[in-house]
Amino acid sequence: MAKVPDLFEDLKNCYSENEEYSSEIDHLTLNQKSFYDASYDPLHEDCTDKFMSPSTSETSKTPQLTLKKSVVMVAANGKILKKRRLSLNQFLTADDLEAIANEVEEEIMKPRSVAPNFYSSEKYNYQKIIKSQFILNDNLSQSVIRKAGGKYLAAAALQNLDDAVKFDMGAYTSKEDSKLPVTLRISKTRLFVSAQNEDEPVLLKEMPETPKTIRDETNLLFFWERHGSKNYFKSVAHPKLFIATQEEQLVHMARGLPSVTDFQILETQS
C-alpha cells in the first residue's frame, strides 16, 4: 500500500528553507548598506595594510574631499581656463567640482604698461629770460646773498648792494594761463635755485645748461605771483611753500609767518 505523503513535514521543511534564505538576504543587505553608507577617515601610517572596521558614527556622512594644492583646469591646447587655490582645510564637494567645470573661461590678468604721462609731471617748456641781473630784498630791508661755500643763500642787511646776489628769471609755459612758472638762476652762472621741503634751506643746483623742457625736476620751478610791489615765489613741486627769509637764517621754504615770503625786485639794468 502506497505511503501517503506527510504534508505537515513538507510544510515544515519549506518553512525552514525560507527562513535560512531570508536570513542570508538580510545579512547581505546589511553588508551592502555598511559598504555604501559608511565613510572612512584616512588611515594613519601605522595602520597601513591593517583592517579597520567602520564605527557606527561613520555611517551616513556626505562624501567630502580635502585639497592641499591649487585646482587647475587646462584646455586641450594647454591654455589655463581656471585656477583656484584652496586652503588646507577647505572641503570640496561634488557640486563644487561640477561648478568649476562649468565656469566660463576667465581672462588671465596681465600687468598693463603704464603710460609715461602717469609717471611724469606736467611738461614745462622754456620761453625766454624775462628779467636779468635783479636783486631780491625782503620787507626787513635784507638782500639775498650767497652764503660762504656757495651752496646756500641767506638774507642780510647790506650797505653795498654789489654784494647782493643778482638773478636772471627764465619764463616757462604752463597749462594755466593765470600762473607763470619761472626759474631763478644766479646771473652769469649755471646755478639754479632749487626748492626743498618745508623749513629746509633752498639749494643752488648746477645744471649743464638752461633746461629747455622740465618734467620731473620741478624743484627748479616757481610760480611768480605779484601783488602790487610784493613778489612771491611759490614752489611748483611744493605748492604750499614759498621762498622765505628770516633774520640770521638761510633762505628756506615756508608757508608764511614767522618767515617772510614777499620780496621786492630791484632792477640793476635799465
Swiss-Prot record:
Residues 1-112 form a propeptide. Its main location: nucleus. InterPro entries: IL-1_alpha, IL-1_CS, IL-1_fam, IL-1_propep, IL1/FGF. The modification Phosphoserine is found at S87. It is found in: Nucleus; Cytoplasm; Secreted. Glycans are attached at N139. The modification N6-acetyllysine is found at K82. GO terms for cellular component: cytosol; extracellular space; nucleus. Keywords: Acetylation, Cytokine, Cytoplasm, Glycoprotein, Inflammatory response, Mitogen, Nucleus, Phosphoprotein, Pyrogen, Secreted. Residues 82-86 are annotated as: Nuclear localization signal (NLS). One of its GO terms (molecular function) is cytokine activity. One of its GO terms (biological process) is inflammatory response. Acetylated within its nuclear localization sequence, which impacts subcellular localization. Proteolytic processed by CAPN1 in a calcium-dependent manner. Cleavage from 31 kDa precursor to 18 kDa biologically active molecules. Cytokine constitutively present intracellularly in nearly all resting non-hematopoietic cells that plays an important role in inflammation and bridges the innate and adaptive immune systems. After binding to its receptor IL1R1 together with its accessory protein IL1RAP, forms the high affinity interleukin-1 receptor complex. Signaling involves the recruitment of adapter molecules such as MYD88, IRAK1 or IRAK4. In turn, mediates the activation of NF-kappa-B and the three MAPK pathways p38, p42/p44 and JNK pathways. Belongs to the IL-1 family. Monomer. Interacts with TMED10; the interaction mediates the translocation from the cytoplasm into the ERGIC (endoplasmic reticulum-Golgi intermediate compartment) and thereby secretion. Interacts with IL1R1. Interacts with S100A13; this interaction is the first step in the export of IL1A, followed by direct translocation of this complex across the plasma membrane. PANTHER family: INTERLEUKIN-1 ALPHA, INTERLEUKIN-1 FAMILY MEMBER. The similarity among the IL-1 precursors suggests that the amino ends of these proteins serve some as yet undefined function. This is Interleukin-1 alpha. It comes from Felis catus (Cat).
